[in-house]
Amino acid sequence: MSTDIHPIDSRLSGMLKSDKVLKGIFNSIPCPSIIEMCGYAGFDFVVIDNEHGSADFQTTENMLRAARSSGITPIVRCFERDIPRVLDMGASGVQVPMVETPEQALRLSRMI
């Protein structure tokens, strides 16, 4: 039996540097099955919204597992305090809301 496993990787960086038009989806529904369907539907990435969405960390981790198993690159929209945790869970990247200055952006980029 062969299984296609998508470990934590650097696909996001490569995708952003390519000339390819990327297809992504923004999801705030705390349901791993939706993430899995997006992967099998051919989306390149998904942004899991933990700012406005109602997913707890356990559900977020399961959504990240669903992303990996279906081949979609997961990005988590989260607050600054949650960056280390969601990266440890397997997010390929983070989107941090309310970044208002270049200095703040630089400081956040150094956390990753």
Name the predicted role of every residue range:
Residues 1-112:
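Expand to "…catalyze enediolate/carbanion chemistry for C-C bond making/breaking, isomerization
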